[in-house]
């Protein structure tokens, strides 16, 4: 038969001799094992092989499982698991035998288990890496700032900054207008989206004014007809005085400095009625006060050209903050407490009208003035009182009681909820305000986003509270910031230990510089770790008015982070040209973006240290050095009859305080980081909190409750503005204001009284530290 199945036929073999018997045995065997008596029938069909059915998936899985079990599981069980189990069982028996010699086996097992778990937990805590991603310091209690900053660097969203800025600067938004209402809603919505708890939207009533009717008519010598200079709503100074003047002589006064006015007075140019025509100076408030003091009936400010545009007008406030900030009609109290005073009694309001004009408009008047009188450094002449006369009308829309709003958000601290810092920025602008103040508002919103992302990502809380505030009413003599301070004076003085203002940050010039004005306690904080930055930092004392002024006046340390161009209000700030379209290309520039990212990271780093370092990072050493040096210079300005012994006794006590603090902090650092004390002992933590409490009160306790002589708004006897400030000498202009004002008028007996008062304040505040025996040192042997 033909082999059609392809298998090999077996070779012939010899058959067994006993054939019949084998057949019988074979049949019996087959029946015994259940085999069929006949072989199966194989059907041949056309000599073709049947195709095999495909193997099912479940069969493949079963075959793989069996293979894996045979080749892996069984060998591992046989060669590893079973021997290990035998070893563990043997060790357990030996261990139980050992425990039975000590006590009850079950009890001793549980004690051993607890000890082992405690050791493991301690090792995990000490490892700086916890399962939730939060990195703690080596003491098991403090956050890992490096980890937080690494995350912040990756999370800075420049596209969000651009989107926020484009919207916020898309409309004029003076306080109390519909534009401000829209921006406030946007900011509150941003707070809410970032999960920031809205601590409140504070509304205050304040003196405000808005563009109204203005007109200016010019008459040259012997001209009775004259000509009009067209004015519009851009010819407006916030806080300006209303008035109407007819046929009044005008003279040019350069920048109306004290020297300029003295020169003009010497030449008899300030006799009778006159209007001053001036270029904007560094301090508009001082120009206003100078004009009033010398008897001017009005003042007209000439704006500088912006590039080739000589038609731009800078709308600067003309309030007088050297007498105080806030609502002009409720000085030193929040508006709802008592009835407002009359506007004529308000010291911080100017008493003469003012308007700003463009360079082109100013040239029309300057062209009429003769080349006589005083010649100034810009080669312009004052002219004479007979050269030109003006009709001037200033009729702004005054609202004596109009709302301004502050928006306040908060992240609560985990350790010292009674201590806090504030990060703030102004919000309002007479125009679009892209470069200032809108960019500062956007920086504030971005900081909020970064902080809240760190809170969620790492389940993190700072040790102390942090407030984020968008101040309103800044163009109305810092009304929003001041009224908040006046409403909550005691609460803020007891809780807030630093105000950081980010409103003057910018990336618009090529200097890549940051100007930081701050209290001497904060100087070391802002100067350290600057080697790897893409920008330079210059730290100086506070020498500028702003939303921080009411807090400085009450002794709270402040820090103002500024870019030079914004700080000096360079063009196009305060003009209608300060629009998003002007700066969008700079904002999208890669290098500018890198600088902005570095600035944002710098702000996070420094604010993080302030709210999350175990110690409030105040440098008593720098503060003491500052006091000693500055007071020695102050003494040189006085005759020998003025005795400074009480003052220098105060600085000596502060030197002792410095040594005490440095000793305690050094011992604390050694205990926590050198001796391996992973958990801060409770008594040490309480003493550290006491140090923080005393540190936070240094500034507010160095104030006079009754305020400075003739300027009672200012309580701070060490830091604050003189009545007449000099931009070229910020240290003398903004330190020991009452004493320096009295030195200026050579009232030496009053200087002696004020020096003694200062000495008493320094001595008493130093003794707060020195008399606390718990803060003299740490006995590390006890821990």
Swiss-Prot record:
Subcellular localization, as worded in the UniProt entry: Cell membrane
Gene Ontology cellular-component terms listed: fungal-type vacuole; plasma membrane
Residues in the Extracellular compartment per record: 128-783
Sequence ranges assigned to domain PA in this UniProt record: 241-333
Coiled-coil annotated spans: none
Annotated Gene3D superfamilies: 3.50.30.30, Transferrin receptor-like, dimerisation domain, Zn peptidases
SUPFAM superfamilies found in the cross-reference section: PA domain, Transferrin receptor-like dimerisation domain, Zn-dependent exopeptidases
GO molecular function: carboxypeptidase activity
InterPro entries assigned to the protein according to its UniProt record, in alphabetical order: PA_dom_sf, Peptidase_M28B, TFR-like_dimer_dom, TFR-like_dimer_dom_sf
Glycosylation positions in this chain: 139, 213, 529
Region Disordered, annotated ranges: 1-22
Keywords assigned by UniProt, alphabetized: Cell membrane, Glycoprotein, Membrane, Signal-anchor, Transmembrane, Transmembrane helix
Key word Electron transport present: no
Segments in the Cytoplasmic topological domain: 1-109
Membrane-crossing segments per the record: 110-127
Membrane topology of this protein: Single-pass type II membrane protein
Domain of life of the organism encoding this protein: Eukaryota
Additional information: Present with 396 molecules/cell in log phase SD medium.
Name this polypeptide is given: Uncharacterized protein TRE1
